Amino acid sequence: MAAPVAPGAVDQLAADLGNTSLGGGDNRAAPAINTNVAPGEYQTADPDTAGPTPSSAAPHPQSSASLYVGELDPSVTEAMLFELFSQIGSVASIRVCRDTITRRSLGYAYVNYNSTSDGEKALEELNYTLIKGRPCRIMWSQRDPALRKTGQGNVFIKNLDVAIDNKALHDTFAAFGNILSCKVAQDENGNSKGYGFVHYETDEAAAQAIKHVNNMLLNEKKVYVGYHIPKKDRQSKFEEMKANFTNIYVKNISLEATDEEFRDLFAKYGDVTSSSLARDSEGKSRGFGFVNFTTHECAAKAVEELNGKEFRGQDLYVGRAQKKHEREEELRKSYEAARLEKANKYQGVNLYIKNLADDIDDDKLRQMFSEYGPITSAKVMRDAVTEGSAEEETEGKDKENKKEGEQAAEAEGEAEGAEKKTEKKGDRRLGKSKGFGFVCFSNPDDATKAVAEMNQRMIEGKPLYVALAQRKDVRKNQLEASIQARNQLRMQQAAAQAGLPQQYMQTPVYYAPGQQPNFMPPGGRGMPFPQGGLGMPAVQGGRPGQFPPYAQQGGRGGMPPQQLPIYPLGQFPPGAYPQPNNPQFLAAIQQVQQQAAALGNGRGGPGGPGGRGMQGMPVPQGMPGGPGMAGFPPNGRPQNGNMGGRGGPGRGGNFAAGRGAPPAGPLAAGGELNASSLLQSQLTATNNPQQQKQILGENLFPKIQALQPDLAGKITGMLLEMDNAELVNLLEDEAALVAKVNEAMAVYDEYVKSQQGPGQGPAPTQGEAEAEKPKEEKAEEKA
């Protein structure tokens, strides 16, 4: 620590600082450092004013030579810092801290030297060096957060002149002891906020600085120096300060009012310590001011009696003076409350309409929905019109040509021409329609009725999409949840079609870094799939929320549970089952399906006469056709039924009757597992009606698409309104399905004709509908 400084020397230093400008432009400005020059050029001629004093560069009791370098420009790289700091000594490493996502610099770095002496020299010579036009701030790196956050030796200085920067503040307070860090608070533009912090190594140095610099003049401004109070301690006293305020804020003051009149207005309520009217750079009043009383009672009485009182023809506002951050917080809360109130006000009455034709404007949109109830507003969203476009210039020339011809016309003709010009001018101000808009009703019931009747209605050959308007964040969350659920269902259906065990249809398991999922070996002799429960990867450790390793279900050739080997991710033993998204696994499934398609179902399939498992392997216990097989794996859920044929799936998804197949389970008469029983097993596997409809829709759509490819989606949606039992019958009876599709087409054609209004023309043909599809898709993308 530095030796104590005599009070006379401190007073002399303060006097010098008070009579000297600390801004840039004099010998106090930090020199711009060229990283190609010698280290000696970093030092200035006057060590007392241009750089840190010897006390601040004294050997620091650090076990490592790690320096913190702050206030860096975002474009500063490790190479730039190495070029600068390597001139002091051997640099072990340099790291610029960056954002983990954007990789943008956070404005600070760490420089590690091989020796502590090099770190001390760099702290003394390179502190406040200009790097990319900004003075860097260097201090010892403190790895212990408890020591970094302690308030011991931390001094707060306020009412600083804007010309005082980090270096000038460091030079002022370095005479009292070793400074660990020194910083002047700045705004986003780099301008001083008028306060700063100095962190000393010891409390004694901080006490000396407070004693000798508090209430002294620095650049002709009296500064306040005191111990720094942590924010959490200030917040705890904030409510008490609010209840016992003495400073009041007054606005709506007449611009002709003087300071004396303003003070006399409040003097009769108690002893006024200070009063001030805010003025601009020209000395004119800004219409507000502040008054501070000695006691809270006087301030409260003034607020109570003067708030709303007339003064020089204007009603005053008198209230407790608030900090800027407090006022901003209140404004933020009031804005949020108003936004929520507005959202609740229009909840259930504001409709969102998309897939609008380009020629539909606000008036036509209002007319379309006016039959359902009173409308408060209707708006079609449009692109912004750019001024000076080529079209406007062309129209301007046409306007001039028309004007010459109108000079010889009669007064009525001129009036009509002026009206036409006004209409054209108004049309030019409207940009191109974005294809969507909003309609707000006054009654939620009217809005609900409009959604029910206008959604999917054909308007000018395009089906409208009408729904309740939602906030952007709510809509985004719903879309993400819907996409996730849809992907999950597709994974389950793909796994079922590929003949995967039930475990592969579950939600993927997240594995923490450093943890590897493991795979169990097959449970039966020659078994191509793991038996019940073995397909799910197991996680080592058994922490909460993770799946434990599944026990083996036994079977011929299977090993006891304690002898099961554990295989790391990506390495599978012969016959083990990889994850469904593995490219090798998908290729194997495709190969098996091709082989099955070539061989066909029936003879040679699992369970058939002479039937064998995949790759010529014998059928294990628990597989279709094997001993004890009832069509279900040990987990109780049915396997996919399209596994006929030798070694793989067969056409039609039917099994040939096998010697080892008992008559139990979902086997149909004659021992064949047909598509109906498979569909029934899928429907009974879930109790969710929405998922059942989804399964039926997935089975209906390809059949309907073969009959009506253009309207397959709409017809499928119409048929899904039927009961599930009727839908299953349609899937089994091809003739009934064709009849029902024809009936749905007739109903749809009749509906389209009934909705056609005058002037809208006939329903679009198939070619027109196909040509209209790209426009609809673009409109949906824009929406």
Curated annotation (Swiss-Prot):
Domain RRM: start-end pairs: 65-143, 153-230, 246-323, 349-471
Segments crossing the lipid bilayer: none
PABC domain mapped to chain residues: 676-753
Region (Disordered): 16-65, 381-428, 596-671, 752-783
GO terms for MF: RNA binding
Location(s) in or outside the cell: Cytoplasm; Nucleus
GO CC annotations on file: cytoplasm; nucleus
Main location: cytoplasm
Keyword Iron in annotation: no
GO terms classed as biological process: mRNA processing; mRNA transport; regulation of translation
Role: Binds the poly(A) tail of mRNA. Appears to be an important mediator of the multiple roles of the poly(A) tail in mRNA biogenesis, stability and translation. In the nucleus, involved in both mRNA cleavage and polyadenylation. Is also required for efficient mRNA export to the cytoplasm. Acts in concert with a poly(A)-specific nuclease (PAN) to affect poly(A) tail shortening, which may occur concomitantly with either nucleocytoplasmic mRNA transport or translational initiation.
Family: Belongs to the polyadenylate-binding protein type-1 family.
Protein name stated in the entry: Polyadenylate-binding protein, cytoplasmic and nuclear
Organism: Chaetomium globosum (strain ATCC 6205 / CBS 148.51 / DSM 1962 / NBRC 6347 / NRRL 1970)
